[in-house]
Amino acid sequence: MVSGVRIRGQEHLPVEDASIVVSNHNSHLDTMVLMSLYPVSRLPKVRPVAAFDYFMKNKYVAWFSQNVIGIIPLKRKVSKDEGHPFAPVHTALENGETIIIFPEGSRGEPEEMKSFKTGVAHLSKDFPDVPVVPIYIHGAGKSLPKGEALFVPFIIDVVIGEALYNKDESHKAFTARLEEKIVQLELTYKERE
């Protein structure tokens, strides 16, 4: 990484076994920042979920994204014939891998959060014993904002919260709790700055 990364709450990040890492999303750097939290030995099992339509449209980007970064390409719209959209994510979790997912669905404006979609709640319902780790990232949206190609070095802050589990909550209730937790992490960051 060219930017510096300050981390709070590293002790909350599981580095073995399956987990679902969830964060706000303002930049392509977000994925690299989250991957940098793990030891090199774990990286082959850290799998970012990424938009198929964006990362698979160019064969060079597709190759790099799948073979170097290890993305799980996910189609935003799936026909019934194509099966369950989360099938490859389920397989990764069953194999003890770490999933990185951004519940806003796509990158937003720098330092602004959009409402969360319910995908993580579906995963957490299917895998109730897998920890859902909430993370707030600040600064990546300034370093490499959406739509920009020029990187500007900034300090990027990462605040990791305690894991959440979904035993019997509705998708809507769990999503609201997860979103509130990441907003709380944002407030914690702002109070200390």
Q: What residues fall within each predicted segment?
A:
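Helix-to-loop junction immediately C-terminal to a conserved catalytic motif
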Residues: 1-25, 94
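A cross-family acyltransferase "interaction/gating" segment
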Residues: 98, 110-172
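N-terminal/domain-start segments enriched in small and hydrophobic, helix-friendly residues
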Residues: 22, 29-37, 51-52, 57, ...
